[in-house]
Amino acid sequence: DLRLVPNQTAEEVLAKLKAHLARRGFGDIEVNFTGGYSPTATSPDAPIIKAQVAVLKRHGIDPVLWPRLAGSYPGFVFTDAPLSLAAGHFGLGHGGGAHAPDEYLVIESTNPKVSGFDGAALSYVEYLYELAK
């Protein structure tokens, strides 16, 4: 699994991986490319990111903006041409263990900085309202 950053392509990284293996005497290893997609990035100054930050701050959360995620998703469909739209992840709820047997989402929270399911859903309404301003 290779995670790309801007200005990289899957083909370029695959070629570099094969060259790296060959230089170290592992040229006989077969690398199977099963698919992939381009990296994605959105400016922190994009209106959708500013709207997300505004909602989080109103709820007493000082957000940390991460330019890259440990996970992956095909965001390039939105951020690359021809759409060239901003994209970001947002929410006041909490979950973990994504895509695993122990995946969870907090339904009712006792932590004032972590919304339960209802607060998380309402945060999207607030976010869309902020974005529409």
Name each model-derived stretch.
Residues 13-21:
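Short amphipathic alpha-helices in soluble, non-transmembrane regions
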Residues 21-25, 56, 60, 128-132:
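Structural signal for hydrophobic packing residues in well-ordered secondary-structure cores
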